[in-house]
């Protein structure tokens, strides 16, 4: 279930549903309510399903030998923490886009039970325990800030309360960004979770949405430092065997946010020469998945 949810969220976030400053009214035209209901049912089942679960958990003592729900009372469901977080984001987004969604009350009931002040404080407390400074860095961090951004922009009484409840963990993750990225000398260009461009993209969206100038300035500076001089990326080598990102397109997706339109056009021509002619072909042809039951190979789907 969590693998299918990841695929669903990838589709949603690649569409207008995750475009910064997008209008819910305009976004809704890109998806039917029947499709939205299908995604909603998928996520509702996943975020309330505790097992199977693959925790990224450092145990500091015997007291830390606990199950997912005890460790993460808000985000225990799905295969891992970040999948639970982006499942919650998708459900909030669907509520905003489709206020008459048949599953709307189920979604609100679940969110009311998960996104309590007590649960979110426990999630924040988990982050600050010893030896957990790299927990979910930066994929889970980015998805949590996307959830925080979604709730921040929602004019809804429940949404405002849930947004407030997120604040302890939101502040913790923002502080992690501000502390970590000045120390990361080189970007991570992998096609999976640690991808630096992805981690910066969603965080930049959040920073701009809430007008967090220090975070915005840091991300824009780091993005230019890491990527502004890149040219002729070997995108023909993509995809890697277990990628769910295109490293080249993810980098371009970040730089379109950072550069002016004129700068970006010039940068993209040098970064992906031949793109306007359909080259490299690997970026235009779906990857082949030989075994969808394999949790790594299915990343390609």
Q: For each of these PLM feature ranges, what is it?
A:
Residues 2-15:
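Bacterial N-terminal signal peptides
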Residues 14-22, 252:
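Boundary at the C-terminal end of the N-terminal hydrophobic targeting segment
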Residues 24-76:
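Low-complexity, Ser/Thr/Pro/Gly-enriched N-terminal "stalk/linker" regions
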Residues 26-36, 52, 94-109, 151-170, ...:
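Structural helix-adjacent loops and short alpha-helical linkers that scaffold large soluble proteins
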Residues 28-33, 68-85, 125-142, 183-196, ...:
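Solvent-exposed loop and edge beta-strand segments that line ligand/cofactor-binding
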Residues 41-44, 48, 52, 73-77, ...:
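HEAT/HEAT-like alpha-solenoid repeats
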Residues 69-73, 85, 92-207:
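Extended ligand-binding groove/face enriched in aromatic
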Residues 208-301:
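Long, repeat-rich segments with strong aromatic
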